[in-house]
Design a protein with these regions (language model features):
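Short, solvent-exposed loop/turn and secondary-structure capping segments
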Residues: 50-53, 114-115, 142-143
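Glycine-rich, aromatic-bearing surface loops/beta-hairpins
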Residues: 118-119, 123-158
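Residue-level marker of positions within ordered structural domains that often coincide
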Residues: 17, 41-42, 107, 121, ...
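N-terminal capping segments
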Residues: 1-69
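Active-site-proximal beta-strand/loop segments in catalytic clefts of secreted hydrolases
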Residues: 52, 104-107, 133-136
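...with weaker cross-activation on analogous glycine-rich loops/strands in unrelated enzymes
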Residues: 58-130
Length: 158
């Protein structure tokens, strides 16, 4: 199934400053950014992967895959998935497209911390790329406005 980038972006813009009641809000449990990114990806793909432990799915707050809400877990799922559901590759920032995910690391003491969704890829530079996100709720926020030390652009392939 082809990834519907327009649907992912439309979802991101609709829910950037709100919470879809169909999904739990993880803001008080470590952050909601990857939950929001997963919702956007799902809006664009329409397919979940129900493989226990290593899949990517959300049924309820207590019945979800770690990849649905974890930054590094989402990365591992998207870049290694060979079954149902979305896939991605790490790419150069200049190749990023609307509906892709850009993961950010804010400190040497942590792994990657944040998973904003690209709503406008611009010309592929941090000043022109605009993202939507939860935890640090935003829509059309310039990527360059984040203070990150490392970046991981994930381009959706399916």
């Amino acid at each position: 199934m082809e990834y519907n980038r327009a649907a992912a972006v439309a979802y991101a813009k609709k829910w950037a400053y709100g919470r879809n009641p169909a999904f739990f809000d993880f803001s008080d449990l470590g952050g909601d950014c990857t939950n929001f990114a997963s919702q956007c990806i799902y809006a664009g793909s329409g397919v979940m992967n129900y493989t226990p432990t290593y899949g990517w799915y959300y049924i309820s707050v207590n019945n979800r895959a770690p990849a649905w809400t974890g930054v590094d877990e989402l990365y591992r799922f998207l870049t290694t998935n060979r079954g149902a559901g979305p896939r991605a590759v790490v790419t150069d920032l200049s190749q990023i497209r609307d509906g892709d995910i850009i993961q950010l690391q804010f400190s040497q003491k942590t792994r990657f911390d944040h998973s904003p969704v690209v709503v406008d890829a611009g010309n592929g530079t941090p000043n022109s790329i605009l993202v939507a996100a939860h935890s640090y709720d935003a829509d059309c926020r310039p990527l360059s406005s984040y203070k990150y030390i490392n970046i991981r652009p994930l381009q959706k392939r399916k």
